[in-house]
Amino acid sequence: MGDIVFVSAALYLANSPNWKSKVLKPGFSPIPSNELYNFEQTLKSTSQEPVSSTAVSKAPEKSALDAEDGGLRLDYKGPKYQELRLFLPISLTQQLHTLVIQNIPESATKTADFIQWLEQATTKHFSTKTDGTKVEDLVENWSSVIASTLESTQDIFIRMYPLTEFAQVVLYWIEWFSKATDSVTTVHIDENTARYIDDIVPSSYTPDVTEEELVALRTQIADLKSSVSESSTENAAMVAYEVDMSTLSDLPKSSLNQLVKDIIEFRTRVLTMEREKRTQEALEEGRRRRSQLKRVMEQIRKSKGSSVPATEPEEDEDEYEDEDGEEDWAIERRRLEKEKESAQQSYNALLSHLNGTVMPDLRARKQRLILLKDYEAKLQRERAFFLKELLHLGNSDYYDHRREFKEEEEQQDDVDRRAQNEQRIQAPKDAVLQASASASRSPDTSAAHSAPVQEPVAKEQKIKLALKRVFDTRAQEAESDSEPEADIPATAVSASTPAPTADLPDRLPFQGPELAARMAELRQSRLVDELVNEYLGVYEDELVDYILDNIVENASRGQLLLELQETFDDDSVRIVDAIWAKLLKH
C-alpha cells in the first residue's frame, strides 16, 4: 500500500489542505503515487473558471501561481481550453450544446485568440439583445485536434453555455463561415443538436451576415495561416510534447520544473534538426530529378536528330516545355478515351446481362407466380389430361419384362463383351440339359443332417433383400398382366421339367488344391452366372459369389440345395445338379 495515495478531487478544488491521504477515507479515490503530479495538473486545468467580474481580483493570484510554477505551464491556450479526453460531454445538455469548426488553420499560439475574437464578434452581432449576453458567457470550454498535417489544419470543438440565443448563434456561425470561406471552413453539428435547434429556434429568425463581418473573419483566418513561423513552430512543438511525469516521480519537486523545461527544449531541438535534415534531403532529391530530366530531354533530342545544341537559351527550353505539355495533353486525352471506352464496355455488358438474363428470369418468375396463384383451378381443369397420361404411361411396353426380343439383347450383350475383351466361355447347352435331365427330383436325405450355413448374417440378409425385390417385381408384373394365359397340358409341363439325377454324390470326392482348381474352372466358365440369370430373371453377382463360397466351405450338394430352395424353389434341384455335373466332369 506504500505506492497508493488516496485523493479527493472535491477537496482539492475547494483548496483544502487535506485533499490527499495515505489511508482510505470516505469520498477518497486511490491512485498510484507516481500519478499524483498528473492528477494535480489535471485538476489545475479544470479548476480554471471563466473570466467574470471577479477576474481583476483573481489576476494577482493567477500571476503568483504562474511565477511559482516557474513557467512550466505555458498558458498559451487560455483558461477555457481542455484536453480532448477531458472535453468529452458527460451529459445530454453538454452534448446538445457542442459543435465543431472544421478545417481551421492550425496555430499553436493564436487559436485561443481566435476563439476570443469569435466570442467578441458574436456578442457584438447580438448586442441588441436585452439580456446582456457577455463574452465570458458564450463559450464554456473548447478543445482542438489536428485534422491534416499536410495542410496544417485543425478541428476546434466548442461547448457553449445553454443560452436562450443558442440556436440563433449556431445558425449565424454556420452562415458566417460558409459565406466567408466558400464552404472550406464549416461549422458542423450532430443530428441531435440539429433537431434541438429546429425545436427552439424562432420561426421568423434568418441569419444576417454583413460584408464587414465576412471581411473580418477572412482576415482572422488569414492571420492564423500566416502565424506558422519558425518561432511559433518551435513553441508549438515544445508545448505539444508532453513529458511522462511517472518516470520522474523520484526526483525532488524543486528541480523538477527546470528538468522538464530542459527535456522539452532538447526534444524541440532534435525535432528542428530532423525537420531541417528532411528539408535538405527533399531539396537534393529535387535537384537530382531535375538533372535526370535534363539528361532524358537531351537523349530525346539526339534520338530525333535535332541540331539544337545542348546549351540552348531559355526561350528554346520554354518551347520544349510547351511541346511536352502538348504531348501530355494528348496522353491525357487518350487516357480519357480509354476510360470512356471501358465505361461503355461495362455498360454494354450490364445491359446485355439485363436483357439476356435478368429480364427473362423476371418474366418467367412472373408467369410462374401467376400459375401458382391459379394452381388449384388448373389441377381441376386439366385433371382429365393427367389421368389420360397416367393411363398411357401405365400400359407402356417398357413395363413388360418378358419381351420377345430378350434373346436378341443377350446376343448383343455377348458382342459387346467380346468388343471389350471380356472372355466369356459359355458351357454347352446340351451338357447343361443332360445334367438337368439326369438330376434327381428327390432331395438327398443327408441334406437334412448337414451343418448350418456359416456365412455372415449381414451377407445373407443383403442377398435375401435383393431377391425379395426381384420377387416383388415379378408379382407386380403378374398382376398387371390382364391377358388370360392358355392352359398348358400337364404332359407338356412334365416334359419341360427334367427329372433330377440320383447318381450324383452328396459330397465332392476331392479337396484342397484340386477343389480350388475345379472352382476356378467353374468360375471361369460362368455357368453359375448363366443359371442365376436364367432362373432368377436378373443377374445378381452377390448371389453368384454366395453360391461359390458355399461350395468351397461345405462341399456338400445337400447343403447347397437347402440354401437355394428358399430362393429358387423347385428350380434349385436343376441348378445344383448342373453345378455338380460341371464339377465332377473330367
From Swiss-Prot:
Coiled-coil annotation reads 274-356
Keyword Transferase tagged: no
Query: Biased composition, Low complexity: where in the chain?
Result: 489-502
Entry's Gene Ontology BP terms: mRNA splicing, via spliceosome
Q: Where is the composition biased (Acidic residues)?
A: 312-328
Which parts of the sequence are annotated with region: Disordered? 276-328, 406-455, 474-506
- Record's SMART domains? PWI
Q: Where is this gene product found?
A: Cytoplasm; Nucleus
Is the Iron keyword given for this protein?
Answer: no
Question: Do you know which Pfam families this protein is assigned to?
Answer: SNU71_N, SNU71_RBD
Tell me which family the UniProt entry assigns to this protein.
Answer: Belongs to the SNU71 family.
Q: What's this chain's function?
A: Component of the U1 snRNP particle, which recognizes and binds the 5'-splice site of pre-mRNA. Together with other non-snRNP factors, U1 snRNP forms the spliceosomal commitment complex, that targets pre-mRNA to the splicing pathway.
* Complex formation: Component of the U1 snRNP particle, a subcomplex of the spliceosome.
Name the UniProt record assigns to this protein? U1 small nuclear ribonucleoprotein component SNU71
The major lineage groups are:
Eukaryota, Fungi, Dikarya, Ascomycota, Saccharomycotina
